Amino acid sequence: AHLINFPGDRTEQILLDFLSQPSGEQAVQIAKRKAVEVLGRLGATQSVPVIGQCLESDDIYLVENSVWALQQLKCCDPAIIGRMLSLLQDKSQNLRVLIQCLAGLKVQESVESIRLLQDSENLGVRGAAISAIAQLLNDKSNLGKIVEHLTVPNQMDRQSAVQDLIDANASDFLPAIVSAPVSPAFRMRACRQILNDSDSMLIDANILSLIDTVLCDDPSDIDIVHKYDQQPSVEFLLQDLFSTDFSRCYLALMSLRQCSSEVLWPLMSDLWEREAHNDYGAHYFFMRIFGSRSDWPQDGLRHALEIIQESIINRRPQFRKSRAAAIQALHFLSSDLFINTMPDFLSESVDAPWDCRYMTVMCIENMAEMNLSLKEKILSHFMDDSDVFVRARSEICLSRVRELSA
């Protein structure tokens, strides 16, 4: 796996030589799965024939990774594509990955086989098949069936549904994706990928409102799947913020609104020190809670502001989605501190991601107490931003400010 950090002919040849070695040992088979994946990620097109041979393996996971790699490498070898078409008839294989690959490679010969899988009992296979038909035939009439998968009990099926809509470039269903009970990072990726080819002139207020909704991430905007039979304890709700199922997290976040800040703060403070500070899921939801109310106990508010400021400039990748949430929380709890520290959390030294800059623009726009000329001056700095969505958001904000100034 570390060879991905050393791209080049020598690395690719080492991996190809390794794949050519016959061995039935489990450790070797596992390593071959990774080798195929790395070759795909490296874009090693000369490896296509060797990876194609891996489709004959009895190891279904090696076959799965080989199919994925062949899609990355844009395989057009008729014999290899023919083998993948035949694998569609083998129910022991990962049919979802096969369908995604054949659709991604625009293999028209796969249409009839894939069409039959649109009624599969497996939701992941069914959704991929519907998405593939939309891509191959430009027939989007069945995409609404994938939307139904966005609120099924199993989170993996929900995430698969989002990916299927991304693959089909289903822009009409962006509102449904935005409200799906999956990771906000995944929903945002869907928005950006589907709108990826848009020019800033075409990104209107309606599109930006979807981005705003994901970034603000109010649990009342989420189609929560779960529900409680009776109101759980505060301790239980806080623990649910660690769940790997985002529907449970959003349900807990919504339910915690009924708890007073006096009761909530000591429990949160203790849990933060013990676990939440190092759990990227709970870390994010703690930022949401910090920025959801202004009546924290005085000592709690001071501590929360310290945590928030540290989180804004935390460059560890796993805590990336917390940064914009922390900016919003800081703006809500202390607008003066927000203004005073804004140059620091937007400086090049902390490498502020696009969503942090976007959130800053949103916060500036909402500062009713700020002088309009100062607001216009600050927003103007974002007009040359490298990100198309930040530019579009700042342009809309500026036009609104100038209307008020006129």
Show the residue positions of the predicted features:
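Short, flexible, glycine-rich and Lys/Arg-enriched loop motifs at helix boundaries
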Residues: 20-30, 213-216
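Amphipathic alpha-helical scaffolding segments comprising HEAT/armadillo-like alpha-solenoid repeats
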Residues: 6-22, 44-56, 75-88, 107-119, ...
